[in-house]
Regions:
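Acidic/polar-rich alpha-helix caps and helix-coil junctions
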Residues: 1-73, 85-86, 92-275
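Mobile gating loops/cap/lid regions near enzyme active sites that modulate substrate access
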Residues: 79-80
Length: 275
């Protein structure tokens, strides 16, 4: 799977079409790309995210002890293993976005000093983990969004339901939903499914939305949770929320802010005559 094939080519074409508003092309390429890559259906398989043999992975890179770039990849977002960073925690409100019965709910655990851990990424015992580049879940989400934006709501829920069913959920109820409501729910599903994989900021830019962060209310902040500790014990803590809920200048999050853009380093600008 480390060598791109026809599925990967379609997998690259699909988000390109989505970005440029070619809805039909995006849906066709995404559905073609996903063929043959079965979705994960249990939390045990979902928790780890470090094995190239995962049926959902379309493109990835195997890592070994002698050929590993160590701490620069997904598996170091592990919040359980002492050798990982243990600092990439979920928004305390993120868990509220999941429906009862969703296998991904099993990945949440209150831990450390009151942080909500999301055990999606795990490092292997030998301190490595295969690197995921593309998987079929993203393809189903691209197809669903593209079809919804094209106005084919009945067709859009088909790939959405393929993903929902694999995650332990019933079919999406389209009754009474508008096009915008369906698109919003598909984008919400992208947040649930692709958390931690690097899609957040690009989706914010692509859809011209704002970062969504809420501070804990007084009532929420006063709650107590039994938080797992790395020695296997539990301690009671109040929950910890976001440290930053506004831009660096203190203003609220808004769409299309320059704060969302990554600046090209000055050294690169000076060294590259093509810029």
């Amino acid at each position: 799977k480390f060598k791109p094939d026809g599925s990967v080519v379609n997998g690259l074409l699909a988000p390109s079409c989505l970005l440029t508003g070619q809805w039909g092309g995006a849906a066709d390429a995404a559905l073609e790309a996903a063929k043959g890559y079965a979705l994960m259906t249990d939390a045990k398989t979902y928790m780890g995210f470090n094995d190239l043999s995962n049926t959902e992975w379309m493109w990835g890179h195997p890592q070994s002890v002698s050929q590993s770039d160590a701490s620069y990849n997904f598996y170091y977002i592990d919040v359980v293993t002492p050798d990982a960073y243990n600092s990439f925690m979920a928004d305390p409100h993120f868990m509220d976005l999941f429906e009862a019965g969703d296998i991904r709910l099993d990945l949440f655990q209150w831990m450390r000093e009151g942080y909500l851990g999301y055990r999606k990424f795990r490092i292997r015992a030998d301190q490595t983990g295969d690197i995921v580049v593309m998987r079929s879940a993203e393809m189903y989400l691209i197809a669903a969004e593209a079809l919804a934006r094209e106005g084919q709501l009945g067709e859009a829920v088909k790939p959405l339901n393929t993903l929902r069913n694999a995650r332990g959920l019933a079919d999406y109820d389209l009754t009474g939903k508008t096009q915008e409501q369906l698109i919003g729910d598909i984008l919400l599903e992208r947040r649930r499914e692709l958390w931690g994989e690097g899609f957040g900021i690009t989706d914010i830019l692509r859809t011209q939305r704002a970062v969504a962060r809420e501070a804990l209310t007084k009532e929420e902040a006063e709650k107590k949770y039994d938080c797992w500790q790395q020695d296997g014990s539990y301690k009671e803590y109040n929950p910890e929320g976001h440290w930053f809920t506004s831009f660096p200048d203190g203003t609220r999050f808004v769409p299309n802010s320059t704060y969302y853009l990554y600046s090209i380093p000055e050294k690169e600008t000076n060294a590259n005559p093509n810029l």
